[in-house]
Every structure is written in structure tokens, then in C-alpha cells.
Amino acid sequence: MKTGFVALAGKPNVGKSSLVNAIVGRKVLIVSDKPQTTRNRINVIHTTNDFQVIFVDTPGIHKPLYRLGEYMVKAAVSALKGVDLILTVIDAKEGIGKPEAFVFDYVNQSNTKTIGVINKIDLVGTEKVETLQKIMEEKLTNCISIVKTSATRNEGTKELLDLIIENLPEGPQYYPEDMVTDRPLSFMVSEIVREKIFHFTYEEIPHSVAVIVEEIKERDNGILYIRANIYVDRNSQKGIIIGNKGTMIKKIGQNARQEIEYLVGGKVFLDLHVKVKRNWRDKDFIILNEIGMKDDIRR
């Protein structure tokens, strides 16, 4: 069978996670319209009788403002090493500028063959897409093809998957056929909660939040009890997350619980607590150990 690892590279908010979800035909990765939603490297496994593709979703490559951002970029760049193929993704509407050139440099340095992906083509005209294609072909030294996609409309994703499979080697099956990610339930829960915070809050709030699952335990009545802490930088942010009379934390909790119940196939009691850890985004221990960046850089 055809098997291999396929890393995604691109600046924040080009639709890398949405693209993977569209290709595998289910929501595995959290998504939002805000940049830097993805913080960790996540393997998404797509298996059939003929192939197993392991998509390595990565944080957007950007110039960081905090230590957290530095580790995110390290995780993204390290993911480009040792894979069989790279999908270099750009946003058709944003075009190609300095941030894209920054990404292209890292991709070229990896010496790994790449497929250029022009995503969000539904937002621009054909002429602009053709111009972007020519630039990508010129700037990406190991580019084997360019594919035009719209992840939200599921356009071009089948063509992209076919091209990926065509360029993967014959090899062993790395993961069981029913496995869709190598991340544990605690990680998936923290990501779902964080996605809801991204959805319901604005400006700096989503980026100032870390979600750490402290306990997962099945109770005697069969309900899965999950306790998680939501960490923020400042007391004012804590007040926004909790909301007037607890309305915001209730909304976040209800929406997250519904998705977690779908994930585990059973009833869930989600116990959320909001705590302040000042300047946590610049503290190495929290970033490396509690958020798991240490493993992302080593993988």
C-alpha cells in the first residue's frame, strides 16, 4: 500500500486545518477564522485499503511576539524534516508577500518535494489564481505541482489527495485503520474547549488562553467526568471568559460538551475553571510541559 507522512506549511490562517478536515471527510482539527488557532503539531491519519496518509498539521509559520510563538514556529519547522511530502499552502485572497516568502524559504531548505496549494480560490478570480500559480512555481524549488482548492466548498481536495497518493512510496501501515489521530483524549478535549473560546471571544482573548485537562474519569453512572482549567494572563481576561453572571463560560462549556459527547459517543460532565497565570505565554515550563510543545519539537 502507499503510505507516508505529509506535512502542511503555511502562514497562519491560510486554511491548513480546514483543508485536512475536508480531505479526510470529517472534523478532526479545530478551526476558526482567527489566525494562530493551531498551536501544536497534530498527526491526522487517513486510511483505506490502498493507502495510509499521515497529515502533519502544524502551527502557522510567523514572526513571533511571545515565547509561545517561538516554540510554535519551531514545531512547524521541525515538522518539515523527515516527511515524504510537504503541502505548501497559501491564501488566494491574501496573495504572496513577505510572510509567504518566509514560509517558502523554510520549505526550500527542507529539500523535500512539495505540492503548492492555492486555497480559498472561491474568494478571487481566475486571473489572480493563475498569477499566484506562476509565482509559486518560480519560488518553490522542489515543487512538483500546483493544486487549487477551496476547503470550505470541498473543491480540489480529491485532486489533491490523488496527487499526494501518487507521490508517496510503497510502505508499511504505521497506524491501526480505525485511528484518526495519535493525540490522546485529553488533548482533543483541550482543543475543543479552546476552539469554542476562539469562536465566542475576540481580539487578544483567544490568544491569551491555555486549556489544560486535569482529570478524565468515568463515573459509576456511566457519565464521563472531565475537569479542565482555562488559564489567562490577567484578571480582566478572566472576567471576560466567565462573562456576566457566568453566561460566557456556560456558553463555552455547553458547546464544547456537545462536541466532546459526539467524539466519545456518550454523556459528558464538563467542569471548567478559569485561572490567572500571569505572562504564561513567556514561561518556558508552561509552554513546554503543560501545553506539550516539548514533544512537538522532538517529534
From Swiss-Prot:
Chief localization: cytoplasm
Localization terms from the record: Cytoplasm; Cell inner membrane
Signal sequence, renumbered to the chain: none
Sequence ranges assigned to domain Era-type G in this UniProt record: 2-170
Record's GO cellular component terms: cytosol; plasma membrane
Molecular function GO terms recorded: GTP binding; GTPase activity; ribosomal small subunit binding; small ribosomal subunit rRNA binding
A Pfam family hit: KH_2
CDD domains: Era, KH-II_Era
All copies of domain KH type-2, residue ranges: 201-278
GO biological processes: ribosomal small subunit assembly
Location of the region described as G3 in the Swiss-Prot/TrEMBL record: 57-60
Ligand binding (GTP): 10-17, 57-61, 119-122
PROSITE patterns for the chain: G_ERA, KH_TYPE_2
Annotated segments matching region G2: 36-40
Region (G5): 149-151
Quaternary data: Monomer.
Function: An essential GTPase that binds both GDP and GTP, with rapid nucleotide exchange. Plays a role in 16S rRNA processing and 30S ribosomal subunit biogenesis and possibly also in cell cycle regulation and energy metabolism.
Entry protein name: GTPase Era
